[in-house]
Structure formats: structure tokens, C-alpha cells
Amino acid sequence: MQNKKDNSNKELVFKVLEADELLPFIMKKMNGISRTKAKNILTSGSVYVNGKSVTQHNYQLTPEMEVRIGKNHKLNQVESQWVKIVYEDQYLFVVEKKAGIICHSPNPADETVQSILNQYLEKNHQRCHAHTIHRLDRDTSGLLLFAKDKKVALKFEENWKETVYDRRYVALVHGEMRKQEGTISSWLKDNAQFVTYSSKYDNGGKFAVTHYKLIKVSDGYSLVELKLDTGRKNQIRVHLQDIGFPVVGDPKYGDGDDKIGRLGLHAFKLCFIHPITRQDLKFETPFPKSFDI
């Protein structure tokens, strides 16, 4: 019996028709999953050949053998409430982080997205480390990229605009917008207290451009889609404050009103050209339920 669908809640059973090694057999039978994913399944102890648990990648299969992959085999799962792996291959991760955790820290004792991924890599016997490619603020949720080695991270950094061609956010803001769409541009610069200030004129800071499009208006709030030409620190929060529609739950650049119990900002879309395989990869997550208005 061959399973046509990769479903981690079902037991998968396959009959061996021709000689093969166990690792490539799993990759073929499970809808062409990556080598890394197949290794993770084997390492987890979920694979049985003729009733015997097998973790050996090159275990030799012969015709008429039965390969069984147990229920709840864990594919790309980390043991953390903060992070979910959306995509993984031998070069990089795409992850979705919750609001409330930082991406990385110089203090190794801090729990960060990076430290959680490094624990996952170690547990799954992958000899590499997670390298930060870009960041989201602690209180912003959404999609993030991490590389598995410095060379891949450097390829993103050297060709960021050409490689990562579409990043979009959704924001819940105070006020009912009337304008359907627009562009905000200014120079952004931090003061000594690390508060970012915006200026229409060059203030020695960095030029930033944010495009916005209204999604919905309801009862004193607006839901807005945002696309960035630049990725400056606090760019979206400062720019939305500039036009009089501060992000909900923002104590720094808004009034701090906590209607939804968090900052109303989520990175929902990420599209890029894989720097190694040249695949065009597109990822999108649902808007947080708390953003419903």
C-alpha cells in the first residue's frame, strides 16, 4: 500500500518492489521530501523494516520487504512554543516566529529563535549552525530566514534586493484610513535613547520607503498591508506613526493601547530566489486571529 499524501498523523506502509537503500526509498515514497527531512524521520526511530526499528541510512532493502513509518513521525518540528519550521533544506530554514521572542542575542543563555534552531540541528545530528539573515522585532510575529552556514548567509547579504524580492507585513492600526493606498518615505535616525526619528529631509539617517494598501476598516481600526523597499529598524512602526495611524499595542511609537494583547504587526509573506538551487520559493502565513476586526 502506497500513501499518496504526507500525513504525520497516519501510519505509512510501503512494499519494496526493487532493491534500494532505505534513505532514498523514503525520499521517493514520501512525495520527494528532502534528504534532510528523510534523515530526520530515520533518526527519530519512526521507521520499521519488517517490524524492526531501523535508523541506518544505507540499510539495504530487497523486494517483498515491508517499510512502515509510524504514526506522528515528526517532520521539521522543533520542541518550542515560539518557533515553527515552515521550510527546510540542506542550506536554509524558513521559520515562523511568534510575538515575544528575539531572533538572536550575544548572550548564549538567552532563548532566541537562533538558539532554538541550533538545539533542533544538534538533536537531529546536523553538523551546522543557524545563521541570522534578517530579523524581526521581539514583538513582531511572522516569517524569517536562517542559513545553515555562513556562505549561504553571505549570498543573501550580497544580493539582498535581487534575492529576496517580496516581503509583506500586515498591521492593525488605530484610526480609520480613508486613503486606499500610498507610499511613505523619509530618513530614519536613532537618538541617544535608541528612539527612531523620522524626517522628510536628510538628517544623516537612512532613507526608508514603505508602501501601504488598506485591507479593511472597522470601528476605529484599520487593517493594512505593507511592502518595504528598504528594511530599516522600526521602519513600519515609525512610518505608520508619521501618517497618523500608529500600530496597535505599540508603547514606543503609539499610545500603547493593548486591544489585542500584543503588537499588531505580522510578517505574512516572504518570496525569494534560492541562492544555491535558484528555485523561486514563496511562503505565506495566515493573519493572526487577533487581527480580525
Residue ranges of each PLM-predicted region?
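RNA pseudouridine synthases
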Residues: 2-293
